[in-house]
C-alpha cells in the first residue's frame, strides 16, 4: 500500500468514526438516525426547523438559543459553500451522518473513476478570493460568538444567563427549570450534535484533500502544517479551517505550476 493510499484510508477511518459518533449521540438523545420530516412539533429535521425555527418559538426563546444558532448557521453556510453538494442524503441523514458519508465518497473517488483527489474539487476562477471571504466571514463569526459567551460568563449576572458559555456554546440550557421551551432545547441539542460531528467532518475532508494532493506530488503534510490547520479550526471554526486547507492546496498547486 502506497503512502497516498494509507493516508486516504486513515482519513476514511476518521470519517467512519465520526459517522458512528453522530449516530450513537443522536440515539442516546432520542433522535432518529434518519430524519424523515416530522411536523408534530416535538421532533425536527436537522434542516427544518432546526436552522430556521418556527417564528413563535424563536420569538419566545431567542435569548437562550440565538448565539449557538448564529454560530452553527455561519459554520454550515461556510462549509456548504465550499464542499457540500445539495443531495437528498443530507436531508434524510442530517449533517452529522451525511457529511462523513459524502467525505468517504470523495476520498475513494479515485479508486472508482481513476481521477485524483485534486480533480474532485478542481480550482475555479476566483476560487481563492471566495475562500478568503469564507475564511474571514466564518472565522469572525466564530470568534465573536465565543467572545460574547465568555463575557457573559465572566459578568455572571442573571440577565446574562442565556448567553453563558454552558447555556450556549458548551451545552444547552436545561429548560426543565429555566424559562425556555423544551422543544427548542431539543432542537438546540440536535444542532449541537450536527456541529460537533458534521462540521468536524467537513474540516477533515478539506485536510484530507490537501494531504492527498501533497502526497500525489511527492510532498507530505508535516506536523507543523497540520498543527497550523488545527489551530485555525480551533480558533476560527471548522469552516474557516476547511477554507484555509483548500487555500493552502491552491497555493501549493500555483507554486508547482510556476516551477
From Swiss-Prot:
The chain crosses the membrane at residues 5-25, 64-84, 87-107, 134-154, 221-241. Its main location: membrane. It comes from the Eukaryota. It is found in: Membrane. One of its GO terms (cellular component) is membrane. The keyword Transmembrane applies. Keywords: Membrane, Transmembrane, Transmembrane helix. It is a multi-pass membrane protein. Belongs to the ltmS family. Part of the gene cluster that mediates the biosynthesis of paspalitrems, indole-diterpene (IDT) mycotoxins that are potent tremorgens in mammals. The geranylgeranyl diphosphate (GGPP) synthase idtG is proposed to catalyze the first step in IDT biosynthesis via catalysis of a series of iterative condensations of isopentenyl diphosphate (IPP) with dimethylallyl diphosphate (DMAPP), geranyl diphosphate (GPP), and farnesyl diphosphate (FPP), to form GGPP. Condensation of indole-3-glycerol phosphate with GGPP by the prenyltransferase idtC then forms 3-geranylgeranylindole (3-GGI). This is Indole-diterpene biosynthesis cluster protein S. It comes from Claviceps paspali. The lineage of its organism: Eukaryota, Fungi, Dikarya, Ascomycota, Pezizomycotina. The gene is idtS.
Amino acid at each position: 500500500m502506497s503512502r497516498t493510499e494509507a493516508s486516504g484510508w486513515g482519513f476514511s477511518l476518521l470519517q467512519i468514526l465520526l459517522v458512528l459518533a453522530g449516530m450513537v449521540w443522536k440515539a442516546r438523545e432520542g433522535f432518529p438516525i434518519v430524519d424523515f420530516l416530522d411536523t408534530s412539533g416535538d421532533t425536527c429535521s436537522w434542516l427544518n426547523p432546526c436552522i430556521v425555527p418556527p417564528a413563535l418559538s424563536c420569538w419566545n426563546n431567542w435569548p437562550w438559543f440565538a448565539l449557538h444558532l448564529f454560530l452553527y448557521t455561519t459554520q454550515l453556510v461556510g462549509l456548504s459553500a465550499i464542499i457540500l453538494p445539495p443531495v437528498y442524503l443530507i436531508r434524510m441523514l442530517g449533517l452529522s451522518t451525511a457529511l462523513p458519508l459524502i467525505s468517504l465518497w470523495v476520498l475513494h473517488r479515485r479508486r472508482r473513476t481513476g481521477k485524483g483527489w485534486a480533480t474532485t474539487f478542481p480550482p475555479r476562477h476566483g476560487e481563492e478570493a471566495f475562500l478568503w471571504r469564507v475564511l474571514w466571514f466564518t472565522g469572525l463569526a466564530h470568534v465573536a460568538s465565543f467572545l460574547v459567551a465568555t463575557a457573559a460568563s465572566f459578568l455572571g449576572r442573571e440577565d446574562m444567563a442565556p448567553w453563558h458559555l454552558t447555556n450556549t456554546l458548551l451545552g444547552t440550557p436545561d429548560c426543565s427549570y429555566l424559562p425556555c421551551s423544551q422543544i427548542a432545547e431539543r432542537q438546540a441539542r440536535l444542532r449541537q450534535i450536527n456541529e460537533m460531528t458534521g462540521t468536524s467532518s467537513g474540516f477533515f475532508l478539506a485536510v484530507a484533500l490537501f494531504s492527498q494532493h501533497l502526497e500525489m506530488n511527492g510532498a507530505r503534510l508535516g506536523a507543523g502544517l497540520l498543527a497550523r490547520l488545527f489551530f485555525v479550526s480551533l480558533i476560527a471554526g471548522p469552516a474557516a479551517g476547511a477554507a484555509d486547507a483548500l487555500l493552502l492546496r491552491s497555493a501549493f498547486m500555483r507554486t508547482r505550476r510556476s516551477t
